[in-house]
Amino acid sequence: MLPHVVLTFRRLGCALASCRLAPARHRGSGLLHTAPVARSDRSAPVFTRALAFGDRIALVDQHGRHTYRELYSRSLRLSQEICRLCGCVGGDLREERVSFLCANDASYVVAQWASWMSGGVAVPLYRKHPAAQLEYVICDSQSSVVLASQEYLELLSPVVRKLGVPLLPLTPAIYTGAVEEPAEVPVPEQGWRNKGAMIIYTSGTTGRPKGVLSTHQNIRAVVTGLVHKWAWTKDDVILHVLPLHHVHGVVNALLCPLWVGATCVMMPEFSPQQVWEKFLSSETPRINVFMAVPTIYTKLMEYYDRHFTQPHAQDFLRAVCEEKIRLMVSGSAALPLPVLEKWKNITGHTLLERYGMTEIGMALSGPLTTAVRLPGSVGTPLPGVQVRIVSENPQREACSYTIHAEGDERGTKVTPGFEEKEGELLVRGPSVFREYWNKPEETKSAFTLDGWFKTGDTVVFKDGQYWIRGRTSVDIIKTGGYKVSALEVEWHLLAHPSITDVAVIGVPDMTWGQRVTAVVTLREGHSLSHRELKEWARNVLAPYAVPSELVLVEEIPRNQMGKIDKKALIRHFHPS
């Protein structure tokens, strides 16, 4: 075991003896301050609540501690710079897009809030995406300005220069700038409800990523639903280890705590060692909420197996986790039962499973009460969410489907004769997105004629809860909590000079959920190793989309219509 981990045990051992693991109290917050910002608008974004939490600690990162007042003041200052640069009238960008690339720290929150304060739509970029993918998002979103932390200026400068988009560097004042007393009403009162708030890019069955545009009402609906369901309070402290370009990291793990005045401890990179140290540390603020994808839990357990080998250390770890941490959540990918069971043995926690996607935020969640959680189930609808399980029925005129079950937070009604019958999940409610950016036809086709969003996921209702059976489309691969479009990967791989044909499939994997596998046909006389393919693909694909397996074949089988039967490919190459 590492020396400093042992030291942590010794220090916590003393704490254990003295406090007997009494639940930690939140540090004193002093006087709370309020400001009359957008009181009349029930869809106002999270920053309008910040001054009410005043000098409470909002974030802890590698730069230090940041209060709500500090984040607000720095965001306001940055929003004014954005408006000056863009020449917006009356301090309102009127939904112009603001792309930003920041580290997992306070700079991200400041950039997000500043985008909203200036009346813009926030477009978060992912720091591990290659330049070509960043260029695609900035171009497709038609961003008016790009914000970037100092460490990403070199990466983004040639991209924005090529696109002709102004670049606004974020200075160190983002972290340490003096706090100015904000005006009584610092941002223009505006109708937030239907105003565009954020575009998150998600992979789809059509290939290139689509921009999912959510309104402030959409985001508020997700946040308030989760705050209610998971009993968030100002005394919570969450450890944040997730990427900040999808709903799990942005909404669930960041906006929820900031909504209630809680504290978010942000790690710049996921590190199993540092996560365990944070769990076991007696320093304040003390972690009591954690959210991750199944792959992260697997990595944590692998570290545990290597370093927590002594029975007394294992007992101590379990005692601390049981007494100090109130909620642990898994999402973004199916949670393998062995992972759930082993995590419970290690920490005493039965992971709460939930279901959502970029277009709908969160729709289903397991119960907060651990005793009634069913392993493998994603629970029941969140407040405000309506769901249906349906199957196609083209003979019906009013709507082209048959309803198996329909429910909301109050309960689910099953159609007689359709008990425990699988079907596609449809979702409706205030959390459902406004549109795919600049894609009206794809937006239209994503909904039924009567206005329900088609998730493309196969589900079943049984034992009083909902169970996800998998994607209706084999062209969506969920790996390590990320959603990868097989078609987009194929599109890029076909540009390789040695490849003539390719099929990308998702193969079941205990660690990653699915792994990206490329079935490839090469040009005559060419050769290609997996290592060579990975090195080439890293220049055009996100790290998680680079194929982790290469299968070379003389010909990829297709049907009479020229289509590839990917389910048959998976069965052929991976029969287990």
Swiss-Prot record:
Keyword field: ATP-binding, Fatty acid metabolism, Ligase, Lipid metabolism, Mitochondrion, Nucleotide-binding, Transit peptide
Family annotation (PROSITE patterns): AMP_BINDING (PS00455)
EC number per UniProt: 6.2.1.76
Ribosomal protein in keyword set: no
GO biological process: fatty acid biosynthetic process; fatty acid metabolic process; long-chain fatty-acyl-CoA biosynthetic process; malonate catabolic process
InterPro entries named among the record's database cross-references: AMP-bd_C, AMP-bd_C_sf, AMP-binding_CS, AMP-dep_synth/lig_dom, ANL_N_sf
Listed Pfam families: AMP-binding, AMP-binding_C
Disease the record associates with this protein: Combined malonic and methylmalonic aciduria: A metabolic disease characterized by malonic and methylmalonic aciduria, with urinary excretion of much larger amounts of methylmalonic acid than malonic acid, in the presence of normal malonyl-CoA decarboxylase activity. Clinical features include coma, ketoacidosis, hypoglycemia, failure to thrive, microcephaly, dystonia, axial hypotonia and/or developmental delay, and neurologic manifestations including seizures, psychiatric disease and/or cognitive decline.
Record family assignment: Belongs to the ATP-dependent AMP-binding enzyme family.
Protein name, per record: Malonate--CoA ligase ACSF3, mitochondrial
Originating species: Homo sapiens
Gene name per UniProt: ACSF3
